[in-house]
């Protein structure tokens, strides 16, 4: 049995199939894990959702920011972004089932055997492992509740930018969501920054990648994330794995086989 983890799909379904073919993926024996953002920029977002949802493929995903935005558009809260190719999802007969399935996906997974943490964007530099897991479960419970639309409608803000255990309600939930699905850079005092999307080498000096801040968890724990395509798979820490390599933007899709840490890639199809 092999454990495979793939970076952000963004609708790149054909590339995923070719990547799985490289390793002769066998869902009866192997596991497939994904870093979220199944949808949006590629042409086959619907196919990606259906593939991951189908139990026979033995695939599990976490939620990314584009997945949450899809939920917001399906709810009529937000408009589809000009470059998002999701019309087929809106027209699909199984749209309601896909929507309900998607909102029931986790924000964080800890692998039951290997213990690595799988998250879309990252983990707060202000949390330990217990807090990280508890905050994920708390935010997931809201998404899986009957009033999740009310929270999604208030999701699109950048505050609060720091953590306090005293936060309650939407402020607390929004911080958790932003950490798991949107975060890239932080200030030295661990406040989140949402303005900078530059490669690390081009970022202002006062900003650091979240995983470069002082937190014992970032040294002790294997962490796999996506979201940050401009890293091109380079986190420069032996236990931190960045898997989004911008397939939807013309680069390639990346997959790691966890048992031996071998990397497999598939170039974007023309």
Curated annotation (Swiss-Prot):
User: Which Pfam family, any one, appears in the UniProt record?
Assistant: Metallophos
Its catalytic activity?
A: P(1),P(4)-bis(5'-adenosyl) tetraphosphate + H2O = 2 ADP + 2 H(+)
Query: What is this enzyme's EC?
Result: 3.6.1.41
- Its EC top class is hydrolase
InterPro entries per the UniProt record, alphabetical: ApaH, Calcineurin-like_PHP_ApaH, Metallo-depent_PP-like
Tell me the Gene3D superfamilies matching this sequence.
3.60.21.10
Q: Which CDD domains match?
A: MPP_ApaH
GO MF terms listed in the record are: bis(5'-nucleosyl)-tetraphosphatase (symmetrical) activity
Domain of life, source organism: Bacteria
Keyword Hydrolase on entry: yes
* UniProt keyword annotations, A-Z: Hydrolase
| PANTHER family tied to this protein | CYTOCHROME C5 (PTHR40942:SF4), PTHR40942
The record's family statement is: Belongs to the Ap4A hydrolase family.
> Function of this protein?
Hydrolyzes diadenosine 5',5'''-P1,P4-tetraphosphate to yield ADP.
NCBIfam families noted in UniProt: apaH, PRK00166.1
Matching entries from HAMAP family are given as:
ApaH (MF_00199)
Q: What is this protein called?
A: Bis(5'-nucleosyl)-tetraphosphatase, symmetrical
Give the species this sequence originates from: Actinobacillus pleuropneumoniae serotype 3 (strain JL03)
What gene name does this entry carry? apaH
């Amino acid at each position: 049995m092999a454990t495979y983890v793939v970076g952000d799909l963004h609708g790149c379904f054909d590339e995923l199939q070719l990547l799985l073919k490289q390793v002769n993926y066998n869902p009866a024996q192997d596991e497939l894990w994904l870093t979220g953002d199944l949808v949006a920029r590629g042409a086959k977002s619907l196919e990606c959702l259906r593939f991951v949802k189908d139990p026979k493929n033995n695939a599990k995903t976490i939620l990314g920011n584009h997945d949450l935005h899809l939920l917001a558009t399906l709810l009529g809260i937000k408009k589809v972004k000009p470059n998002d190719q999701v019309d087929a999802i809106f027209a699909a007969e199984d749209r309601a089932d896909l929507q309900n399935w998607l909102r029931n996906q986790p924000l964080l997974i800890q692998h039951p055997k290997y213990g690595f943490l799988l998250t879309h964007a990252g983990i707060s530099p202000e949390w330990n492992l217990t807090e990280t897991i508890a905050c994920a479960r708390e935010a997931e419970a809201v998404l899986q509740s009957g009033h999740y639309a009310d929270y999604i409608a208030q999701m699109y803000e950048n505050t609060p930018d720091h953590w306090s255990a005293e936060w309650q309600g939407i402020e607390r939930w929004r911080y958790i969501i932003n950490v798991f699905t949107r975060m890239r850079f932080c200030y030295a005092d661990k406040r989140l920054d949402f303005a900078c999307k530059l490669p690390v080498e081009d970022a202002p000096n006062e900003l650091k990648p979240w995983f470069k801040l002082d937190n014992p968890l970032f040294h002790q724990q294997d962490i796999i994330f996506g979201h940050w395509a401009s890293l091109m798979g380079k986190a420069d820490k032996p236990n931190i794995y960045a898997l989004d390599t911008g397939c939807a933007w013309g680069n390639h899709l990346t997959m790691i086989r966890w048992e031996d840490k071998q990397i497999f890639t598939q170039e974007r199809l023309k």
